[in-house]
Amino acid sequence: GANPDLVSFLVKQALLNVAADLKLNAPTPQTKAEWADLMRQAGIKGIHIAERDTQRSKSPKEPDVFVNTWSVEGFLSEGVQPSELGWGTHEKWMPENARTHQAGCGAAIYLMQPGANTRVRTWCPTRGAQYGFLVTHNESISIADYFTVRDAAGTAVYRPTCHYAYHPCNDAVLSLH
């Protein structure tokens, strides 16, 4: 996995690449507002932070044994928390089981179901198209918030949707069953 700072850096680099491909001829942003405006100009609506754990064991998973390649407690904690994601201003609907937070930056929604029970379609270079668990990861919210454009009154007029889609190693998926 990659930590939130590295992911944020990669999103910025990807944005610069997209802006160059679109020939936006924009200078490299220096402020949060400039980064958010460039994201808006590029027309980006969604950011997927996708991870696929491809590690595998030489021996089969034993029955009644929980297997994971990193912290079992951390994995279970992420898996039982409600799914949470940055919610874009272009989204004109919300899932029936979605809720908004009463406090905070206003960039996120959460679903009334655990992340380990929520699948999203995404893409990883190692496997291509895949389904991942929509688990809570702070960078999903901090990135959506960072790239929010607000009007003079402080109302969000642009924000990309951002979520983290995690596909654990196959033995960890079996352990969840």
Pin down the residues of each PLM region:
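Domain-scale recognition of functional cores that engage charged ligands
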Residues: G1-Q13
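C-terminal catalytic/substrate-binding lobe primarily of soluble NAD(P)-dependent oxidoreductases
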Residues: N17-H177
